[in-house]
Amino acid sequence: MNLREKYGEWGLILGATEGVGKAFCEKIAAGGMNVVMVGRREEKLNVLAGEIRETYGVETKVVRADFSQPGAAETVFAATEGLDMGFMSYVACLHSFGKIQDTPWEKHEAMINVNVVTFLKCFHHYMRIFAAQDRGAVINVSSMTGISSSPWNGQYGAGKAFILKMTEAVACECEGTGVDVEVITLGTTLTPSLLSNLPGGPQGEAVMKIALTPEECVDEAFEKLGKELSVIAGQRNKDSVHDWKANHTEDEYIRYMGSFYRD
């Protein structure tokens, strides 16, 4: 698909440095779009930007922003002003393991800013642009933790639930227009963060067998864009959600999700 012809000249990836964000950068560049890449680690972004320019022959723009800090969204808006924007994906996330009372408020506030406030500011801003021009696309990234809840990782799951439900609603509102909106919900994904914390032995091998690559997740997201409002990445994840909803109570599902994070 020529994404540039369909949606516009520039795409914006929020949380672009590695993993799923990097895969989104490569995907839209392969579709002919120039890429605005936003993240905290400017040096890594510059390396990725150079690779994308060389491989795909598109323009890139690197923006350093910490989504946990006030003003981060406004930094992004200023960097994209005047560009022909046609795509946005919010990939960034922040989590902290532990009980609500054991997590410092400052950490809670940072997670709210990343997972809710900056997300919504960016979604609102670029949806206004896309709606006004009746052209554009959004793919936001949620998590299986947002489908049920995520004990001992509670605020992360709640934030992902917000992204999931907010994007689903907007996707429905956009049906029949020139703007395509979708949320993709990810399960275990082979990101650098996962690989660096992967346990050894049979447990690690089991994770590797079920995990999807970032590229597989992004490919499925684009395959379903404009066709489905809400996508669960991978057949195994789809089957798992269907099984738990059909054959278990909500309490059982909550306790099951908590078993992944409880000490």
From Swiss-Prot:
How does pH influence this protein's activity? Optimum pH is 9-10 for the oxidation of ursodeoxycholate. Optimum pH is 4-6 for the reduction of 7-oxo-LCA and dehydrocholate.
Q: Annotated site (Lowers pKa of active site Tyr), which positions?
A: K160
Keywords for the protein's UniProt record, in alphabetical order? Bile acid catabolism, Lipid degradation, Lipid metabolism, NADP, Nucleotide-binding, Oxidoreductase, Steroid metabolism
The EC class name is: oxidoreductase
Question: Which GO molecular-function terms appear in the entry?
Answer: 7-beta-hydroxysteroid dehydrogenase (NADP+) activity; nucleotide binding
Q: Which GO terms describe its biological process?
A: bile acid catabolic process; lipid catabolic process
Q: Do the record's keywords include Lipid metabolism?
A: yes
**What EC number(s) would the UniProt record show?**
1.1.1.201
Q: Record's InterPro entries? A: NAD(P)-bd_dom_sf, SDR_fam, VLCFA-Steroid_DH
Can you state which reaction this protein catalyses? a 7beta-hydroxysteroid + NADP(+) = a 7-oxosteroid + NADPH + H(+); 7-oxolithocholate + NADPH + H(+) = ursodeoxycholate + NADP(+); 7beta-hydroxy-3,12-dioxo-5beta-cholan-24-oate + NADP(+) = dehydrocholate + NADPH + H(+); ursocholate + NADP(+) = 3alpha,12alpha-dihydroxy-7-oxo-5beta-cholanate + NADPH + H(+)
User: Biotechnological relevance: how is it used?
Assistant: Could be a useful biocatalyst for the preparative production of ursodeoxycholate, an FDA-approved cholic acid derivate drug used to treat cholesterol gallstones and current sole alternative to surgical intervention.
Q: How does it assemble?
A: Homodimer.
Free-text note regarding domains? The 27 C-terminal residues (residues 237-263) are absolutely required for enzymatic activity; a deletion mutant lacking this C-terminal region shows a complete absence of enzymatic activity.
This molecule's function is given as: 7beta-hydroxysteroid dehydrogenase that catalyzes the reduction of the 7-oxo group of 7-oxo-lithocholate (7-oxo-LCA), to yield ursodeoxycholate (UDCA). As C.aerofaciens is an intestinal bacterium, this enzyme probably contributes to the formation of UDCA in the human colon. UDCA is regarded as a chemopreventive beneficial secondary bile acid due to its low hydrophobicity; it protects hepatocytes and bile duct epithelial cells against necrosis and apoptosis induced by more hydrophobic secondary bile acids like deoxycholate (DCA). This enzyme is also able to catalyze the reverse reaction, i.e.
**Which protein family is named in the record?**
Belongs to the short-chain dehydrogenases/reductases (SDR) family.
What is the protein name given in its UniProt record?
Answer: 7beta-hydroxysteroid dehydrogenase
Q: What is the lineage of its organism?
A: Bacteria, Bacillati, Actinomycetota, Coriobacteriia, Coriobacteriales
